[in-house]
Structure formats: C-alpha cells, structure tokens
Amino acid sequence: MNFPADLKYTKDHEWIRVEGDVAYVGITDYAQGELGEIVYVDITTEGETVAKEEVFGTIEAVKTVSDLFMPVSGEVLEVNAELEDAPELVNEDAYGKGWLIKISLTDASELEELLSAEDYQKLIAK
C-alpha cells in the first residue's frame, strides 16, 4: 500500500494535500481497498463551508456506503467532476486523479492535529 509522506491523514481514512491556499482531499489507498469497487461518489457540499470532522459527502461501493469526513474546516471550492462518470478513479489513483474535493482552509492550524504517513500506517496496522 502507498502512503505519500507529503500528505496528512485522518483516523477516518481521508488524506489532505495542501497546495498554497487550497487543499485537495480524498480517501486513502487503504480505505479504497477496504471498500472495494467504488460505484458512486455523492458530494453536494460545493460552495459550502464544512467544519472539521463533519460529513461532506458519501462514497458508495458495491457492498456498502460510507460517509466522507472533512479532515479540516474549510469551504468546498470544487468537486472532482471526473468521478461522476468514472468513480473507479478512486480505486485506480486514490492520491491523484481520484481526489474528491478541493477546499480553502478556514484554520490551517488544524493540519497539525492530523496524522503523518508513518502514524497513519501504525493506525491501520493495529
């Protein structure tokens, strides 16, 4: 499994990649593997400000539906439109083309509370 060191992670298996004033959010390689084949991504929070740990959408696999949680507080600037026709991108490229949302950070200090790649690996090894 792949856990890029330049990302931060949550205990709920989301990742965040900060690029200047914006950040991209997705689910981890571990999470997509546990969910199995992703068939639908439902995110209706574009344009809204969502608090840390609140639900920003759902992701549907063949066997289950899971909530998606905000890793930090922020405004949802964009939803990955490619996932509408190709939700399998989450399975194929969880940290690249399979990103879920682009956000503007409300409180960058919340990033310090997230897990490093090393700490996330320890979490899922339990």
Curated annotation (Swiss-Prot):
Quaternary structure note: The glycine cleavage system is composed of four proteins: P, T, L and H.
Keyword Heme among UniProt keywords: no
Protein family (similarity comment): Belongs to the GcvH family.
Cofactors required: (R)-lipoate
Name listed for the protein in its UniProt record: Glycine cleavage system H protein
Cofactor binding: number and manner: Binds 1 lipoyl cofactor covalently.
Gene Ontology process terms (BP): glycine decarboxylation via glycine cleavage system
Top-level taxon of origin: Bacteria
Organism of this sequence: Parabacteroides distasonis (strain ATCC 8503 / DSM 20701 / CIP 104284 / JCM 5825 / NCTC 11152)
Keywords carried by this UniProt record: Lipoyl
InterPro entries: 2-oxoA_DH_lipoyl-BS (IPR003016), Biotin_lipoyl (IPR000089), GCV_H (IPR002930), GCV_H/Fam206 (IPR033753), GCV_H_sub (IPR017453), Single_hybrid_motif (IPR011053)
N6-lipoyllysine sites (modified residues): 63
CC annotations in GO: cytosol; glycine cleavage complex
